C-alpha cells in the first residue's frame, strides 16, 4: 500500500515524511552528562545503521553536555524533554530537534516558550504522546484509551499551529499493541504531519520484537509511518537490527539480503543450521538488495530458487547452487557454502 502523504521535515540532514526513506531511531541509555559514554553509545548506533539518536535531558548538567555531544555526534541528536521546559529552551540553541511529552511539559505559556526557541533555530518538535503519562484532563475524561491519546495529540498540534509552528512530528505510543495501532490509525487522516512509530516499554528483545513486528509492521503495511524506533530492554544494536528487518519485510526498505530458509523436517540430510549461521555472519555487511534461498532438500528448493538471485538446495552429502532457478554447480556439501558466498559476491559485482 502507498504511504500516506505527509509534510516533510528535516532533523539535521535527515528528511522525515513525504517520499523520504523511513529513518530508524534509537536512544542512548547513558547519563547524558557523561559525554564520553554517551558519544561511545552514539558511535555504536551509527555503525549499527541508526539514522537519528535521542538523548534524555534530566537536569542542567545533561542540557549543558548536549552542546559537546551534538558537535561531535555523527548522527542528528534529539533532546528528550520531560517536566522542565527551560531545558528545552536551553538546548534548542544546539540540538537538531526537541521531543516534548505533552503530559508533563506544562502550561501553554511553557509550550510557547519552547516553540519560540525552536522557531528561531528552525528545528522541529516531536509531540510525543504516551499512554502512561497523559494530561490529567484527557485521562479523566477518556481513561488511558485511544481516544485520550488522540485528544492529547490534537490539542497540542492545534496549540503549536496557533503559535504558527508546523515543523511537527507526532508519536502516539502505548505498551499495548492494539491501542498503539488504533491511535495511529485514528489520527492519521486528521493531520498532515509525519508519524514517528513505536511501541513503548516493549520489553526484552524477544517480546519487543514480536510487539514491534505486529504494530509497526502492520502500520507500515497500511501506509502509515515516516520514522520509527523499536524499543528494547537490551543492547542498542538490537533495536536497529529489528527495526531494519521490519522495514525490509514490510517492503518499505530494500537493503541487504532477504534470506529464505526452510524450518527443516525429517527429510533434512545436512547441517542446514550451521550453513545458515555462516551465511548470515558472512553477508551481514551487504547493502545490495538480494533474494537468496537456503533450503534443506529439493521439495521446495527448486520453486524457491526461481524467485531467488542465488540459491542452495542441500541433499545427502551434496547439493546444488542455482542462479535465478538455473543450476550452476553440483558440489559436495563441504564446498556448498563457500561457492554460495562466491556466487553472491559475483551477483553483486554484476550489478555494478
Swiss-Prot record:
Source organism of the structure: Campylobacter curvus (strain 525.92)
Membrane-crossing residue ranges in chain numbering: none
Role summary: Converts 2C-methyl-D-erythritol 2,4-cyclodiphosphate (ME-2,4cPP) into 1-hydroxy-2-methyl-2-(E)-butenyl 4-diphosphate.
Segments forming a coiled coil: none
Cofactor annotation remark: Binds 1 [4Fe-4S] cluster.
Protein name (Swiss-Prot/TrEMBL): 4-hydroxy-3-methylbut-2-en-1-yl diphosphate synthase (flavodoxin)
GO molecular function: 4 iron, 4 sulfur cluster binding; 4-hydroxy-3-methylbut-2-en-1-yl diphosphate synthase activity (ferredoxin); 4-hydroxy-3-methylbut-2-enyl-diphosphate synthase activity (flavodoxin); iron ion binding
InterPro entries per record: Dihydropteroate_synth-like_sf (IPR011005), IspG_bac (IPR016425), IspG_bac-typ (IPR004588), NO2/SO3_Rdtase_4Fe4S_sf (IPR045854)
NCBIfam families: ispG_gcpE, PRK00366.1
Name of the top EC class for this enzyme: oxidoreductase
Cofactor(s) named in the record: [4Fe-4S] cluster
Amino acid at each position: 500500500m502507498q504511504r500516506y502523504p505527509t509534510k516533510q521535515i528535516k532533523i539535521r540532514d535527515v528528511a522525515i515524511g513525504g517520499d523520504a526513506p523511513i529513518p530508524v531511531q534509537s536512544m542512548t541509555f547513558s547519563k547524558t552528562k557523561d559525554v564520553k559514554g554517551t558519544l561511545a553509545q552514539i558511535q555504536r548506533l551509527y555503525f549499527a545503521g541508526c539514522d537519528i539518536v535521542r538523548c534524555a535531558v534530566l537536569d542542567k548538567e545533561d542540557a549543558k553536555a548536549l552542546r559537546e555531544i551534538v558537535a561531535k555526534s555523527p548522527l542528528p541528536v534529539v533532546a528528550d524533554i520531560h517536566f522542565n521546559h527551560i531545558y528545552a529552551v536551553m538546548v534548542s540553541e544546539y540540538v537538531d530537534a526537541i521531543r516534548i511529552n505533552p503530559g508533563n511539559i506544562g502550561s501553554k505559556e511553557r509550550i510557547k516558550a519552547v516553540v519560540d526557541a525552536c522557531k528561531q533555530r528552525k528545528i522541529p518538535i516531536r509531540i510525543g504522546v504516551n499512554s502512561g503519562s497523559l494530561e490529567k484532563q484527557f485521562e479523566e475524561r477518556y481513561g488511558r484509551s485511544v481516544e485520550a491519546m488522540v485528544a492529547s495529540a490534537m490539542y497540542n498540534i492545534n496549540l503549536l499551529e496557533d503559535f504558527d509552528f508546523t515543523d511537527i512530528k507526532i508519536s502516539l505510543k502505548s505498551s499495548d499493541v492494539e491501542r498503539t495501532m488504533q491511535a495511529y490509525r485514528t489520527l492519521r487522516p486528521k493531520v498532515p504531519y509525519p508519524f514517528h512509530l513505536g511501541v513503548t516499554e516493549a520489553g526484552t528483545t524477544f517480546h519487543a520484537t514480536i510487539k514491534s513486528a505486529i504494530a509497526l509492521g502492520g502500520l507500515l503495511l497500511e501506509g502509515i509511518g515516516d520514522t520509527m524506533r523499536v524499543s528494547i530492554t537490551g543492547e542498542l544494536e538490537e533495536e536497529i537490527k529489528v527495526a531494519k528487518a521490519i522495514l525490509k519485510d514490510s517492503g518499505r526498505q530494500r537493503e541487504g539480503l532477504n534470506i529464505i530458509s526452510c524450518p527443516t523436517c525429517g527429510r533434512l540430510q545436512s547441517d542446514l543450521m550451521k550453513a545458515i549461521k555462516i551465511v548470515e555472519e558472512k553477508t551481514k555487511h551487504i547493502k545490495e538488495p538480494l533474494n537468496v534461498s537456503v533450503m534443506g532438500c529439493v521439495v521446495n528448493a527448486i520453486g524457491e530458487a526461481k524467485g531467488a538471485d542465488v540459491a542452495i538446495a542441500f541433499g545427502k552429502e551434496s547439493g546444488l547452487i542455482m542462479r535465478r532457478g538455473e543450476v550452476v554447480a553440483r558440489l559436495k556439501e563441504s564446498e556448498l557454502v563457500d561457492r554460495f558466498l562466491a556466487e553472491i559476491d559475483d551477483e553483486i559485482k554484476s550489478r555494478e
